[in-house]
Amino acid sequence: MYPAHLLVLLAVCVSLLGASAISNQPRNLVQFSELIQCVNKGKRATYHYMDYGCYCGKGGSGTPVDALDRCCKTHDDCYGQAEKKGCFPFLTLYNFGCFPGGPTCGKGNTCQRFVCDCDLKAALCFAKSPYNNNNYNIDTKKRCK
């Protein structure tokens, strides 16, 4: 085998290894995380919102435990409205800008604007709501009824 062929084969193998390491997490969640960081200026890591209360994170049920959890329920409801409009909020990528005065949603189609608005409203709500460490990683079976 020629050295050039070996280099091409090596490049293909490295590319495939890199592609297999890419998460299948919906890319919209990355944008939502960036919006949160833009609004709170990095004061709280996004992962703190991933397992908070009854609604922040995957799923949601019961009565929200506090104002921050209500932000998450409102965000879930907003995504539900997006789905009713035929959008796929977890997969919809949108344009936004992070400016000194705060983030703004950019131009796009109806679904992109709607989903960006859901995420922006939630990020702003997170920023103004107190964070209670006692509501992080709670026992949802007991507290979310």
From Swiss-Prot:
Record's catalysed reaction(s): a 1,2-diacyl-sn-glycero-3-phosphocholine + H2O = a 1-acyl-sn-glycero-3-phosphocholine + a fatty acid + H(+)
Active site: residue positions: H75, D119
Origin superkingdom: Eukaryota
InterPro entries: PLipase_A2, PLipase_A2_Asp_AS, PLipase_A2_dom, PLipase_A2_dom_sf, PLipase_A2_His_AS
Record's keyword terms, sorted: Calcium, Disulfide bond, Hydrolase, Lipid degradation, Lipid metabolism, Metal-binding, Neurotoxin, Presynaptic neurotoxin, Secreted, Signal, Toxin
Disulfide-bond pairs as recorded: C38-C98, C54-C144, C56-C72, C71-C125, C78-C118, C87-C111, C105-C116
GO biological process, one term: phospholipid metabolic process
Molecular-function GO term, any one: toxin activity
Cofactor binding notes: Binds 1 Ca(2+) ion.
Positions of the pro-segment in this chain: 22-27
EC number, UniProt record: 3.1.1.4
Entry's localization field: Secreted
Cofactor: Ca(2+)
Tissue expression remark: Expressed by the venom gland.
Keyword Amino-acid biosynthesis included in the entry's annotation: no
Binding site for Ca(2+): Y55, G57, G59, D76
Signal peptide: 1-21
Cellular component per GO, a single term: extracellular region
Function: Snake venom phospholipase A2 (PLA2) that inhibits neuromuscular transmission by blocking acetylcholine release from the nerve termini. PLA2 catalyzes the calcium-dependent hydrolysis of the 2-acyl groups in 3-sn-phosphoglycerides.
Family: Belongs to the phospholipase A2 family. Group I subfamily. D49 sub-subfamily.
Protein name: Basic phospholipase A2 PC17
Organism, as annotated: Laticauda colubrina
Top-level taxonomy: Eukaryota, Metazoa, Chordata, Craniata, Vertebrata
